[in-house]
Amino acid sequence: MRLEKSLVLIKPDAVERNLIGKILEVYEGAGLKIKAMEMKQINKEFAEKHYEEHRDKQFFNSLIKYITRSPLVALILEGEDAINKIRSLNGATNPEKAEFGTIRRRFALSGTENSVHASDSIESAEKEIKLWFPKVFYEEICG
């Protein structure tokens, strides 16, 4: 297996409830390495760019309002099969359908306030890392 990188967001609901450490503990306990991490307060335009594939969905405006309401933590995690591993640790988007022990089952408040986001493919990871961490992306690609 090869090393993969994934963007992960610890969303506002989790930050507001002081869950950053508990969530990071899950990822690190699974052998994932933090390659970059930053607390950010994003604006509407940035959020719309990140969630552009959801623009036509009915939940789009409430999602943008939620993700911009207070700071979040953006990080790049790296590990073997990182994308699948992280998605498994996170659990289903809807916390009621997430498996017991997953981050969303343990901490999420709702389908929108679901505590974490993670890239769902290598392609989305590259796109999201480039958006959230352009300097890191540039250094990785251009050396």
UniProtKB/Swiss-Prot annotation:
Its EC number is 2.7.4.6. The active site is at H117 (pros-phosphohistidine intermediate). GO terms for biological process: CTP biosynthetic process; GTP biosynthetic process; UTP biosynthetic process. SMART domains: NDK. ATP binds at K11, F59, R87, T93, R104, N114. Signal peptide: none annotated. GO terms for molecular function: ATP binding; metal ion binding; nucleoside diphosphate kinase activity. CDD domains: NDPk_I. Keywords: ATP-binding, Cytoplasm, Kinase, Magnesium, Metal-binding, Nucleotide metabolism, Nucleotide-binding, Phosphoprotein, Transferase. One of its GO terms (cellular component) is cytoplasm. Its main location: cytoplasm. It is found in: Cytoplasm. It comes from the Bacteria. It is an enzyme of class 2 (transferase). It holds the Pfam family NDK. It catalyses: a 2'-deoxyribonucleoside 5'-diphosphate + ATP = a 2'-deoxyribonucleoside 5'-triphosphate + ADP; a ribonucleoside 5'-diphosphate + ATP = a ribonucleoside 5'-triphosphate + ADP. Belongs to the NDK family. PANTHER family: NUCLEOSIDE DIPHOSPHATE KINASE. Major role in the synthesis of nucleoside triphosphates other than ATP. The ATP gamma phosphate is transferred to the NDP beta phosphate via a ping-pong mechanism, using a phosphorylated active-site intermediate. NCBIfam families: PRK00668.1. This is Nucleoside diphosphate kinase. It comes from Clostridium perfringens (strain 13 / Type A).
